[in-house]
């Protein structure tokens, strides 16, 4: 029986439940094992409590043998690889950002000064560029908590990853889903990262779940992030799509006040994923990314 380590939130257990089902389809018995992380109990902004706060506890639980497999939202993982583990990317969910607003409103329809909840610098900077009049409020908590702030009237809208809404069964709550070229998502958004200790039976099992296109796309996107030496809380975005067998990678660096948006793009074969990510980051540096990031 393989134990799958997961955070206890609805989204996390739903995601890990999918991994459990996929492993069972491959002939492996698996069960979920809840691991409490510091990020689940500390409601301070992620920028303050540290990159990887949601993932480190899961990795340590695997390392000490409490469970054999860890399931992460790939966008939450630090960019540096952890050499203890094999990492597999299964088939990817929707990469887009979603708005959940009162009265079915879209971003353009929100009234002047509307209160919008998000703590992600990447989202804040793009929101300010599109709607500088908005009152952007900090937001933490699970999906239910975040959506509840709109239902209660505390906020007029919140921004969330559409993939999380879909996985948790709340897709219909989205009042607007943004084209990734209009509102750029986090690198590896919509993708899961499944880890197991190298050389173990669990590592063999998760290898069966690997998806080639998702692996190449997320590698390119996360290379943009790592080359910029920016963490998962920086105002950096990356997305990609396929044009035939060509992978098209776009990256963005944004000033937190919305005053500057740097965008770069590269395309090539899946085998060149890392090179594409480096090419995008090189172009962003040429446009002044270092100055924009230093100012944050």
From Swiss-Prot:
Q: Which cofactor does it need?
A: dipyrromethane
**Pathway(s) it belongs to:** Porphyrin-containing compound metabolism; protoporphyrin-IX biosynthesis; coproporphyrinogen-III from 5-aminolevulinate: step 2/4
Catalytic reactions of this protein: 4 porphobilinogen + H2O = hydroxymethylbilane + 4 NH4(+)
Pull one GO CC term from this UniProt entry: cytoplasm
Q: Where are the transmembrane segments?
A: none
Q: Does the keyword Amino-acid biosynthesis apply?
A: no
What does the record's cofactor remark say about binding?
A: Binds 1 dipyrromethane group covalently.
Which UniProt keyword terms apply here?
Porphyrin biosynthesis, Transferase
GO BP annotation list: protoporphyrinogen IX biosynthetic process
Family designation: Belongs to the HMBS family.
Q: What is this protein called?
A: Porphobilinogen deaminase
